[in-house]
Amino acid sequence: MKFSQLLCISVLLVSCSQEKDLDLLTIYTSRQPQLIEPLLAKYKEKTGIEVRLLSGKAPQLMERIAVEGDMTEADIFMTVDAGVLWQAGKKGILEDIDSKILNKNIPEHLRDASGKWFGLSKRARTIVYNSDKVSAEDLSSYEDLADPKWANKLCLRTSTKVYNRSLIASMIDADGYKNTKNTVQGWVKNLATEVFSSDTQVLKAVSAGQCSVTIVNTYYLARLADDPIYSNLRLHWANQDGRGTHVNISGAGVTKFSKNKVEATRLLEWLSSAEAQETYAGANKEFPVMDGIDIGQ
């Protein structure tokens, strides 16, 4: 067989191996699959497009996309935290998407200026307290929880999770590094227990009286709302006399290496629609990025 014939066969095989199934999208996500699978099932019903999830931790997924490059199966990268999305954009793994639908549905401050990523839900991190031990009038701000009056009354989640890191970053922006350092040191002094690995564990400790007050994402409380065991837990919106409660996002972007950027963009557009936003908020107990969505109680 001549070399030219071998070359043609090789090119054909490579082309076939890289051919993309246009009826299949793959999302690399750090979100728990059960939180987004109902939405994706609904999308398949509407469009016939199947969406496959590959789950993992955000840093490892970002690195995997970068290493896989043109050979990656990832069409979309989905994660939590604006800082993580920003890092993905800076890493060069996300495509600039110019979508009139996304730009209309998602407020400017909740998306990347170049279209690399888009917020799909909002999550507020604020104060929750045991109403048997604390009066709402005693609460005010994140910073106030560093006051000695809260000694042996505070529970917190570990700072190894991005939620507290992002909250502290926002405090540094508002209060300055030195003041924020003093606040965090005050929190540590006021701890009633060792730190917990999850917001759910913290809420259980507050409800059980191991401590009186904590800082968590609101959807964790909402997911416990139907259980009478936790009926003594109450939410307090922090810093209402100043900058307001800290709000972060979950979001996604189309990968730079996707072989199906058009359909990937259409999925993000649908996730920003009123139908998807209402479903997302109802299932996950997070807040929609689109205004005017009914989120119930």
Walk through the language-model features, giving the residues of each.
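Short, low-complexity disordered leader/linker segments with a strong preference
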Residues: 1-24
